[in-house]
Amino acid sequence: MSKKYQNFINGSWVDAKSGKTYENRNPANWEELIGLFPKSAKEDVDEAVKAARVAFEKWRLVPPPKRGDIMRRVGDILVSRKEEIAREMTREMGKVLAETRG
């Protein structure tokens, strides 16, 4: 069974409003199903944008040094997961690993 992915909207993982999904396959090995992804439409995007606007109103009130600390931690997490992210990008897009590593 492959992994089923969802949209992250307003702090929750949700399916597309239509309930529809699409398959994403490894272009180097078409038999490898990477996962099922939500087939999002305008309504899903509108909901995500609305949630982002509300979140921004709170985020903009966070003092800049605190925002900087949060963004630095996000960067640290991404760096610590660089190899994992590179391998997933290679599987998903068919790029060579050296390129997805940056």
List the model feature ranges, each with a label:
Residues 30-102:
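Glycine-rich loop-to-alpha-helix module at the N-terminal edge of alpha/beta enzyme cores
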Residues 1-36, 69, 73:
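Terminal low-complexity tails and localization/encapsulation signals of metabolic enzymes
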